[in-house]
C-alpha cells in the first residue's frame, strides 16, 4: 500500500518537484513527496516541459499522461540535484537555485531520450515558440535559456511555431518588459 502524499500549499510545478528532490530526507520517497498531480497541475507541468522542449527544437507531444510528465521532471531534477550536491558552497554563494542550475552548461537535457530538451549550445540556435509557451513558468524557462545564450555571446533566433498570425503575437512578447509585469 502506497503512503499518502504529502499535501503542499499551491500547485505542483517543476520548481516544487525540484525543491522536494533537493531535500535529502525526502528524496528517498519521491512518490510520497510528489503525489498524484491534479489535471490542472499535470497540464501546467506539460506546458513547462513543452516550452522547454520547443527551446531545444524538440517536441514532447507524444507524452500524454501526467505520470510520464512527472517521470521526465524527476529525471531532469535528479540530474540538477547531482550537480547541485557536487557544488562547493560558501556563505557568499549559498545553495544554487533552480534558475542558476538551468544556466549550468552541464545540464544538457531533461533525459537521455532523444525527444527531450537539450540546452542549445550551437553558435546559432533557433527557438520554436508556440502560443502556449508565453504563459507562466514555461515562458520563464524559455527566457532563462535565451538569457544564458545571450551571456555566452551566442545568437538566438525566436521563431513562432504555428500559423502566420501567431508570428506577430509571439515575437514582441519576448521584450524584457513582458517579464516584469
Question: What is each residue range found by the language model?
Answer:
Residues 1-33, 38, 48-58:
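A short, basic N-terminal segment
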Residues 2-9, 95-106:
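Acidic/glycine-enriched edge-of-secondary-structure segments
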Residues 30-33, 59-61, 124-125, 155-157:
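Residue-level preference for the first positions of well-ordered beta-strands
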Residues 33-50, 66-82:
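Glycine-rich phosphate-binding P-loop
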Residues 35-36, 97-100, 127-131:
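Short loop/turn segments at strand-loop or loop-helix junctions that form parts
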Residues 88-91, 96:
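Hydrophobic, aromatic-lined core segments that form the binding pocket/scaffold
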Residues 93, 116, 124-126:
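Conserved active-site beta-strand-loop modules that form the wall/rim of enzyme catalytic pockets
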